[in-house]
Amino acid sequence: MCAKKLKYAAGDDFVRYATPKEAMEETRREFEKEKQRQQQIKVTQAQTPNTRVHSAPIPLQTQYNKNRAENGHHSYGSPQSYSPRHTKTPVDPRYNVIAQKPAGRPIPPAPTHYNNLNTSAQRIASSPPPLIHNQAVPAQLLKKVAPASFDSREDVRDMQVATQLFHNHDVKGKNRLTAEELQNLLQNDDNSHFCISSVDALINLFGASRFGTVNQAEFIALYKRVKSWRKVYVDNDINGSLTISVSEFHNSLQELGYLIPFEVSEKTFDQYAEFINRNGTGKELKFDKFVEALVWLMRLTKLFRKFDTNQEGIATIQYKDFIDATLYLGRFLPH
């Protein structure tokens, strides 16, 4: 089945497949294609002749000796050798993909603090542009190749971390994680474990191969999605309370692409929020309930797109299909 990607004014640009298993297979295929493309680009760069040599100026040392020979002077000494200096142009660390790494070194772990990223960016910005065979790399090449390569390296790191977590918590050694094992793995910012309803929601979304569990490939997809949601959650926790309010929840949905009115965000928030702080005056969302709410919105959006045949944000549904859709969604109602 060919994947169909829709552009909506509301929703998270979710790619529709027959099953989550097909989605994961498509992700692996895209990763392999990107890897082959990067290898082909490297081969092409190595084989491309340097056209800048023909227009380069004569080195200072050669011109100096030539002038002295024409004037009848002997070369008793030579001036300081010419060494071209590159302009210090700030380079985004994501784009600095030409620097060679010693063979055999493992891929460094992903940085856990934004301060580390900023420090790295400042260090790279103070160095000259990267070189290929002692020639400056064109800026167009960096812009074209680097972002995809950076994403690929980050994707590989995510797969390594997720794989290690999977094996660490696969207590029974069955290459599958149960709801209890997944609950022991997933934690909120206050070190409390995810509630079982949030764990069940994730398993129902990603566990396509066998009901009630996730295999390694399914867990990797789950890990990547939860990681991206956590970044949005932390960014919108303005006061650092480890929970988010209804306004922060609405801003999170807007950032994820769910362009819905505040009233709709508020109703969704009320379905999952709890009175966490006894001294507080309103409900709050912890990260596990935030994830559960997003899983519910994903299901609603995906089902809506099924009946939005013109991709205009307007669904036309027959009465029979409406009943079937309602019964289907009823299996995943918040509890």
UniProtKB/Swiss-Prot annotation:
<dbReference type="GO" id="GO:0005829">
    <property type="term" value="C:cytosol"/>
</dbReference>
<dbReference type="InterPro" id="IPR002048">
    <property type="entry name" value="EF_hand_dom"/>
</dbReference>
<dbReference type="InterPro" id="IPR051426">
    <property type="entry name" value="Peflin/Sorcin_CaBP"/>
</dbReference>
<feature type="domain" description="EF-hand 5">
    <location>
        <begin position="301"/>
        <end position="332"/>
    </location>
</feature>
<feature type="binding site">
    <location>
        <position position="239"/>
    </location>
    <ligand>
        <name>Ca(2+) 2</name>
    </ligand>
</feature>
<dbReference type="GO" id="GO:0003400">
    <property type="term" value="P:regulation of COPII vesicle coating"/>
</dbReference>
<feature type="domain" description="EF-hand 3">
    <location>
        <begin position="224"/>
        <end position="259"/>
    </location>
</feature>
<feature type="binding site">
    <location>
        <position position="170"/>
    </location>
    <ligand>
        <name>Ca(2+) 1</name>
    </ligand>
</feature>
<dbReference type="GO" id="GO:0008270">
    <property type="term" value="F:zinc ion binding"/>
</dbReference>
<dbReference type="GO" id="GO:0007121">
    <property type="term" value="P:bipolar cellular bud site selection"/>
</dbReference>
<protein>
    <recommendedName>
        <fullName>Peflin</fullName>
    </recommendedName>
</protein>
<feature type="compositionally biased region" description="Basic and acidic residues">
    <location>
        <begin position="23"/>
        <end position="37"/>
    </location>
</feature>
<keyword id="KW-0963">Cytoplasm</keyword>
<dbReference type="GO" id="GO:0005509">
    <property type="term" value="F:calcium ion binding"/>
</dbReference>
<feature type="binding site">
    <location>
        <position position="243"/>
    </location>
    <ligand>
        <name>Ca(2+) 2</name>
    </ligand>
</feature>
<dbReference type="GO" id="GO:0030427">
    <property type="term" value="C:site of polarized growth"/>
</dbReference>
<dbReference type="InterPro" id="IPR011992">
    <property type="entry name" value="EF-hand-dom_pair"/>
</dbReference>
<feature type="binding site">
    <location>
        <position position="176"/>
    </location>
    <ligand>
        <name>Ca(2+) 1</name>
    </ligand>
</feature>
<keyword id="KW-0106">Calcium</keyword>
<keyword id="KW-0539">Nucleus</keyword>
<dbReference type="GO" id="GO:0005737">
    <property type="term" value="C:cytoplasm"/>
</dbReference>
<dbReference type="GO" id="GO:0005934">
    <property type="term" value="C:cellular bud tip"/>
</dbReference>
<feature type="binding site">
    <location>
        <position position="181"/>
    </location>
    <ligand>
        <name>Ca(2+) 1</name>
    </ligand>
</feature>
<feature type="binding site">
    <location>
        <position position="237"/>
    </location>
    <ligand>
        <name>Ca(2+) 2</name>
    </ligand>
</feature>
<feature type="domain" description="EF-hand 1">
    <location>
        <begin position="144"/>
        <end position="192"/>
    </location>
</feature>
<dbReference type="Pfam" id="PF13499">
    <property type="entry name" value="EF-hand_7"/>
</dbReference>
<feature type="compositionally biased region" description="Polar residues">
    <location>
        <begin position="43"/>
        <end position="53"/>
    </location>
</feature>
<comment type="subunit">
    <text>Homodimer.</text>
</comment>
<dbReference type="GO" id="GO:0007120">
    <property type="term" value="P:axial cellular bud site selection"/>
</dbReference>
<feature type="domain" description="EF-hand 4">
    <location>
        <begin position="260"/>
        <end position="300"/>
    </location>
</feature>
<feature type="region of interest" description="Disordered">
    <location>
        <begin position="23"/>
        <end position="92"/>
    </location>
</feature>
<keyword id="KW-0677">Repeat</keyword>
<comment type="function">
    <text>Calcium-binding protein that is required for polar bud growth and cell wall abscission. Can also bind zinc ions.</text>
</comment>
<dbReference type="GO" id="GO:0005935">
    <property type="term" value="C:cellular bud neck"/>
</dbReference>
<keyword id="KW-0479">Metal-binding</keyword>
<feature type="binding site">
    <location>
        <position position="248"/>
    </location>
    <ligand>
        <name>Ca(2+) 2</name>
    </ligand>
</feature>
<feature type="domain" description="EF-hand 2">
    <location>
        <begin position="198"/>
        <end position="223"/>
    </location>
</feature>
<dbReference type="GO" id="GO:0005634">
    <property type="term" value="C:nucleus"/>
</dbReference>
<feature type="binding site">
    <location>
        <position position="241"/>
    </location>
    <ligand>
        <name>Ca(2+) 2</name>
    </ligand>
</feature>
